[in-house]
Amino acid sequence: MLQPTNRLTLIDAMRPPVAFGLESAMAVTFTLDLRALLAAPAAFALAGHDNLASDGSQHEPIELLHALRSHAGKITVFSQVGEIALPPSRRVFAFLERAVVPVVAPRGGVVHPKVWVLRYEAVDKPIDSQPREQRLRVLIASRNLTFDTSWDTVVRLDEARDSTGALLEPVGDLFEGLLDAAVSDVSVDHRQRVHSLSAALQTAKFALPVGVDHLETHVLGLSRKPSPLPASAERSLIISPFVSDDFFQRVRPAPIDELVSRAESLDHLGPGALDKVAKVYTFDDGSAVDLATEAERSSPHDPGRPLVGLHAKVFAFEDRGRARLFVGSANATGAAFNSNVEILVELTGPAAVLGIDKLCNGTMDEPSLRDLFNTYRPDPPTDPPEAASLDSARCAIARLPIEGIVEESGTGWAVTYQSRKPLPFLDSTEIHCWPLASAGNRRRVATGEPLEARFETSLETISGFLAFELAHEDGTLTFFVVPVPLVGVPEHRERFLLRALVGNAERFLRYLLALLNEDSGQMDLLDAVNGAGEDTADGGNGPLNLPVLEKLLKTMRRDPAKLAGLHPLVTDLAADDALPPGFAELWTMIYDVAIEGAVAR
């Protein structure tokens, strides 16, 4: 169980084993925070703690740039359309534009799983030209790719080192199905990555968690399947933040001993929905969130609205001394088991180890969950209808095929964002949009007409993320981000952006050290993804600074291919006089020797 204070536990679970690095990864999430997505590649290169800071620097942390440059191109992230939260404007998000693939559920619900499939590869070169060793890891959670402070679950499954363990073929089938659920064309790179990882999941076996003697994964919503939940049990407990009448009427009409949910969700149930539930509780950990003014006015389902309190989903059953736990993304709702795309992991084992009491009563080292259960007392709900209409409009806009046309203009560059289909007609509601990298460049657009919004910009602030604000006249707001494919982007855009983010020559030396030092972990992960960083390099200003020269010479001897990968960047920076004095000449000498040595081998 992830507690609210463990914001980085899911990110920490992505870190490679010792002597391994990331080879490729694919993920799916319902709600997406782009800052949390920054943390994913950063997890493969940075040390993580629990400190959150930002100094407002115009430059990004060097370690974060290294992580993005090294790993962002290895990741495919599927996300439900309309559920990307609006983050603070940062140019560095440009490196994530091609990583995000918006999807819709084929049966009319939402794409709701929270899954990571990661493949690591040994860093050390094998003997006798053998392939590098690879290992798989699968994370199945209830927490989205966000920094929410909520109670969640995560199951970590590592590939077994022998022939025993559980097969996870349905996880691969899930991602293959998501390729067909994309709202726009999926690139060849993403398709190849998904096919390769899914194929690996067909044969790999994964070590069982402690206390578990059988494990199955259940993917819901890609096709019609019956509920995997047992029809009856001697004892039952359901923990679900969201509930609906049809779950208790159709999905599992059998009696339930205990139900734990959110009060506001229980309040929406109809009369008689809980007649077969013996005990009904709300989950009260005393959490509260101090929302900013705009968040207070945001619609109930705004993707940027922070989640607190209960968010875990657990279906626990006991029968004849055996326990079955179902954990994952599915809530106790009809939609979860009929129209949504969901995933549940079924864990089976002795009730004494895996049962309801073991789950709820805690240990000497952990507090008891049952202490946070309070008897439910109904309170009639009050939801403004305007909020629901804004959420519907958000999803409709996010589904539109929008593209950005990039072209040079008299002042630099311009991007025209346009759609062939009209935006939804919204009465008493204004729509504003702007490129994510240019928060001050807002433009009001007409409802009920195709989008046509032109923005003058610079090369470094061209953005493949288009931000939207919907504002109802009663003050209700919703904010979201839509990934937009760009047409006509100059080939040197990312290099130009990297130069701008690196900044001065001193920072370049620090960046170079990070690139040459694979175990670089000098910076707090949350500091990095939230923009904190020093503007000076460690250890001096000159090209003959000992750490830099020493690393260059070691790399020349041990891994000349790494210098070859850096050469285009150094050449590009040298052309703009962005390197420290004399560094270009030093680099040329070392690079030439490295390449000659590699050829000689």
Where are these regions (language model features)?
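Terminal interaction modules at protein C-ends
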Residues: 1-324, 334-601
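Short loop/turn segments immediately following the C-termini of beta-strands
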Residues: 330
